[in-house]
Amino acid sequence: VIKIHILALSLLALLPATNALATVCVNEKGVPTEVHYDLTDKFNSSNNQVGQVVTLSEKSQWVGVNAVCPKGTVGNTTKRSYVTDYPVTGTSDGYQYLKLNDYLDGAMKITDSYAGAFYPPKNYIQMGSHPNVSKNKPFGVQDSSLIFRLKVTRRFINMVVIPRATMFRVYVTTTSSDPLTTPVYTISYSGIIQVPQSCAINAGNVVEFDFGDIGASLFSKAGVGNKPEGVSSQSKTIAIKCTNVEANAMLTMRVEAEKVSDNVLVSDNPDVGFIIANESGAPLTPNNLTSKIPFRLDDSAQAQVGIRVWPVSVTGNKPAEGRFTSRGYLRVDYD
C-alpha cells in the first residue's frame, strides 16, 4: 500500500513539469489581431446558379501580425494551425468549403513565405525559422495573398447579407503536440452579395399591422403562444413584382427576424410578440427555410400573396403596460 501511495505522489509531481514543456505562442500585443475580409460583391445572372464559384479580389498584403513565444522555447521553427467552428461541406481544387449561410459556402487559400499556398482549415502546418522564436521576442506571421471563394448552394433574390463572423482562429506553436489554446490572430468576414434578380415586396413600403389598445391582463390569461381573448387577427395581401426573374417562376415567401421565440416574433416588450401566418392561418416559423408560402409569378413576373398576423403572449406573464412593436422581414426566394 505504501508503494502505491508513493508512486501516485511521484506522478503528480511530474505533471507540472510536463505542462511547462508546451510552447504556445501569443500575439505580441497580448490579444488576437482580427484580419477582416469584406465579401461585398455583385454577382451576375450566370453566377447566381447552384454550384457556381466566384473568386473575390485577393487580399494581397501581409496580415501584419507578430507573435512571441514564451521564455524557454527551444528551437526557432514554428507551426501554425487554422481552426474553424464550421463543418467542411466539400473540397474542390484544394479549397475546403465551409457553410456561411443558407445560400453560400466559403473557402480560402493563404500563402506563407515559407510553406507556400495552403487551404485551411488545417492544423500544425510547418512554417519557417526566425531567430526571435527562442529569444522571447516578436517575429512576423508571414501570411499573405488571402484568396476567398464563394460557392452558391441555393439561388437567391435581391441580396444576401452576411453578418460579421469568425471563420478561422490561427494558433502558433513549436510542435504538433502543443495545445491550441490562445489564437494569435483571427480571420473574420462579412459583406453583402447582390444579384440582378430582384423582387419588390409591397412596392418597397413597410407592411404595418396596428392592433390598437389591448389589456395587459389579457395576455397572461391567454397563456404562452396564445392570442388574447377578443383580439382578431389581421389579414393583408402583399404585392410582389420581380425583375430579371423568369415569368411564371415558382417562388416562396418566408419570414426573417432578429428576436424570435419558436414561431413568435418577440417585440420590444419581452412578454409580447406576434405570429405571422399564411392566408389560411398556418403560422410561419421565422428564420426557417422550410417554413414558407409558395407562389407562382404571372406572365408579368408579379404575384399577390396573403398573410395573417396576430399578437400572442410570449411568456404567459402579465406584460408591462405601454406601446409595443416588433419588426420582421419578408424574404422572397426561389422554390
Residue ranges and their predicted role:
Residues 15-19:
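N-terminal signal peptide c-region/cleavage motif recognized by signal peptidases
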Residues 9-10, 20:
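Cleavable N-terminal signal peptides
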Residues 21-335:
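Mature extracellular/passenger domains of Gram-negative fimbrial/pilin and adhesin proteins
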Residues 1-8:
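Bacterial N-terminal signal peptides that target proteins for export
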Residues 1, 13-14, 141:
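Intrinsic-disorder-associated interaction segments
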